[in-house]
Amino acid sequence: MANTAAESITPAHVFHIDRTLYTGRPADLTGRPEKEKVTYDLLDKLGIAYQRLDHDPTATIEACHDIDALLETEICKNLFLRNAQKNSFYLLMIPGCKKFRTAVLSKQIGSARLSFAEPEFMEQYLNITPGSVSVLGLMNDKENRVRLLIDRDILEQEFLGCHPCINTSSLKIRTSDIVNIFLPYIGHSY
């Protein structure tokens, strides 16, 4: 009997999630990147409580749907944008299910021709890579080169989901802790 096309397709990788919802940082940080450790250090220093899931790398918001369900909150869609001159940078936080409309945002903030910023700018200003974009990366923007834009729907949620500057873990954090503790501490506003 011949194989059908569907039978011959094998997934290149099965996405794995450690289904345990942890409170706080990992007990063993061996093998974790420094930028992740520094993120936990700052959250702990500020007294910001968080829950954590560990998982395979997530490169897209679509890959986060199972994580959303386990965290019982929606992972934010974090878009790192720039203007045409490459001298103004923006981190936009919107609900994962919301469509991004460049023209609408451009008009709202008075910046024509927005586009996605290149990975080298993510690394330079936020010390993150594509797939790991997070509000927590703003702790690395010491010169406030990146303007934070938060969708009203995010601000109305009790919790938000984000990465600790690496896309192999996701955190559930009170939105009010990000807005009232984290952002003032790092000198950013929205």
Which residue stretches match the model-derived regions?
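Extended, low-hydrophobicity, polar/charged segments
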Residues: A2-Y190
